[in-house]
Amino acid sequence: MSRATAVSRLARAARAAAAARRHHAGGRDPLRALASLAGDASASAGGGARRPAWFAPPMGRLGGGGLLVPPPPPQRRLFHPTQAARYSTSSSSQITPGEFTEMAWEGVVGAVDAARMSKQQVVEAEHLMKALLEQKDGLARRIFSKAGIDNTSVLQATDEFISRQPKVVGDTSGPIIGSSFVSILDNARKHKKEYADEFVSVEHILRAFTEDKRFGQQLFRDLKIGENELKEAISAVRGSQRVTDQNPEGKYQALEKYGIDMTELARRGKLDPVIGRDDEVRRCIQILCRRTKNNPVIIGEPGVGKTAIAEGLAQRIVRGDVPEPLQNRKLISLDMGALLAGAKFQGQFEERLKAVLKEITASNGQIILFIDEIHTIVGAGAAGGAMDAGNLLKPMLGRGELRCIGATTLDEYRKYIEKDAALERRFQQVYCGEPAVEDTISILRGLRERYELHHGVKISDGALVSAAVLSDRYITGRFLPDKAIDLVDEAAAKLKMEITSKPIELDEVDREIIRLEMEKLSLKNDTDKASKQRLSKLEADLESLKQKQKNLSEHWEYEKSLMTRIRSIKEETDRVNLEIEAAEREYDLNRAAELKYGTLLSLQKQLEEAENKLMEFQQSGKSMLREEVTDVDIAEIVSKWTGIPVSNLQQSEKEKLLLLEDVLHKRVIGQDIAVKSVANAIRRSRAGLSDPNRPIASLMFMGPTGVGKTELGKTLAEFLFNTENALIRIDMSEYMEKHAVSRLVGAPPGYIGYGEGGQLTEAVRRRPYSVVLFDEIEKAHQDVFNILLQLLDDGRITDSQGRTVSFTNCVIIMTSNIGSPLILDTLRNTSDSKEAVYEIMKKQVIDMARQSFRPEFLNRIDEYIVFQPLDTTEINRIVEIQLNRVKNRLRQQKIHLQYTPEAVEHLGSLGFDPNYGARPVKRVIQQMVENEIALSVLKGDFKEDDTVLVDVSSVAIAKGLAPQKKLVLQRLENANLELVAND
């Protein structure tokens, strides 16, 4: 080309820039003029005469000092999703969003932003590559990953190339399309036709980069990826699908995006071992091998191990321990959350799910789908008339084209799946029950190694047994083995935290050093002799403490390093075991033998040496850390969860049962026969001799008022379940009307209160281990006894919402005042001993009960216990108990209370009334002791640290009459006075 021609081109460029400026001034978009300018450049570069090497692409008008262009209007870009960009080529084609997929068009628009951020005016191929690589979850990144190329290295190479390109500083007229950008899009159109697609997609653009001599070819050479490798990666990602809409990228590798390969996790050893559940796994395999409706659904309570059954199946598939129809299959867990997330427009969710189902169908039965919480497919994606996931799955589930395993809880299965009969019949139920305590212990033993490896601690077998037993008894509302596993996990985490934290001994020394250092700074300013002596002594103490701190730190670091070393060896051993399993599966016996008899033996020897070193250090007495989880740790965690004292949890069950009478008699005075009957019923249950399908015991307490019937129920609740709150008290005087009976099990549908549950059923559902006390049962309406019949016989009640509430872990106590006059008259009119009279009196009282209660109700009660009236000796013991309670309350006011035996007898005589039992005693103490002490405290007669004596004095009334006793309160001068019966 001659110099005159070149000057002519420059003049035309200046005129185009001026036209763009005029368009800008008139409020019109300069896009077409700039695009035409780029088109001229590409035309001259492609089909015209050859440009000299010094000729730069026209970028604007020619100025005196260089190329000057007016700035573009704010917030304007070369490509806008709603605008078309025209460039002049031999085909005079046009860039429109309608010919690109959404992700490809985002890349085209993003290339302009990449150029602007790089301060470059010409948008070239490298900017397009950068935009495609920066797309989150973009198709370009997935294709490069599939080809084995690190996306970071591709982006880094692209950035380096961009940084070498010339930058434009100062005012510019906006970005311009470069020739390489144009050729990339042209070649992408050709590849679109090659694939018989309807839209230009990201993979077409990547194929076009292999023909770009300016940037793309060199990039792929540096990455060592050829065109064939790129085509294979694209085929692996998109499979056999065609681009028929503008969002095909979301459907590529749908299973990989929206599913988790459980067989791959099992192959890599990422799944926990599954202990037991062989029957359930075998049943699932049996259903999966059917011709049609080969879809098991695992139902059970939350935490019993439904997902673990699917994991166990995945592990068996990897091991080859399955029938031929399931050999070498993949078990994919569908992530419904990922499937729904980001589906903004109607139809997107259905497209994703159809893509997943299409991949499963294309696998010809090689893929088994697992949907955890399968009830979520009912209604999922159904909005504005769209079909939900359940309806999309139904045809394939029925024909056997899709083998699907579901898992859900009983309540959600009933609430969602059973309502859709067409969906329910396509699934076959596999019930997963709660394992027994013995099975839970086996499961924990199987999981122990995994938790030891994760936390870097040891877990004793006693801790596992304790976790299963204590969780089964005290943690209600959850199910085994989940709650037992959580106990072990939390106890191990607590111990690990203690190991990594500073030991208490070292922490105390550190704090003491800080305190002495501060005291030393304070003493340095004093010049008196005592301060100097104190300073010298303090410096000596500091020196000693710092030496101790150094020794303790060294011991701690050494012990911690040994534990870390043991943990790393165990992790390496676990990795080697996985490699051995993989080698044996692939029949690489040389590799397996090398690992098993070489590497593994070496690791075991290293582990033994490290453990011996740790044991020697611990036996030397220098150890500051604990590495084993024991049953005490488990009991502490249970105590934190439930509030039950640790000492009660650790006390053996046998010891507690043997001492049952003594414990009950601490609060229940007298009533030896009643206490013994209750203790025998509880021991019978705990020994496993009672019916497991009935309550622990159902007892009826009959006797006069105030003799300890309700108190025995409270004491029994505290003994059995370590808290008095475990007593559920139902006052039957509130259920005298017929309409009030429904409050026990909940209001029926249509009535106010439906859905809130019943007072009895909800209380037992929340606290299954409890004592249920029906107080004054004879006052209840007759319909109440109809409810109690099934409770006493079957140990269960169905509430108003159809939920079955179990009473098999409850003690049922009913109190009644029937026969009270008979009991009092019998004892008052006989001189025989209580034991001799008891059986006759009991028979007479039961005969009276038969007149009030129906035979079918009385026949279901385990034992009738008749309480006897209290005598003076027992009343005096109750007085002592009540005075000790007053004493404890006064202790909070820092006032000490003591009393004499005479005072106890006097109060007992005043409060004794066989007709009213022990209740008058409380009133007498309240009037004669508590009122007087309160008055004296307010007057100032009794102050803090005073000792108050409750005594009796004799008062003469008149000559010839015996003096009367009077209760007196006096402040003791000598607080050390020895008195009897004060504790």
UniProtKB/Swiss-Prot annotation:
GO MF annotations, alphabetized: ATP binding; ATP hydrolysis activity
Subcellular location: Mitochondrion
II, as annotated region: 629-820
Chief site of localization: mitochondrion
Chain intervals for the UniProt region annotation (Repeat 1): 100-165
Coiled coil spans: 504-627
Region (I): 255-503
Region annotation Repeat 2: where it falls in the sequence: 177-240
A Pfam entry, by short name: AAA_lid_9
Residues making up the signal peptide according to the UniProt record: none
Domain Clp R: 97-240
Recorded family membership: Belongs to the ClpA/ClpB family.
Protein name per the record: Chaperone protein ClpB3, mitochondrial
Gene assigned in the entry: CLPB3
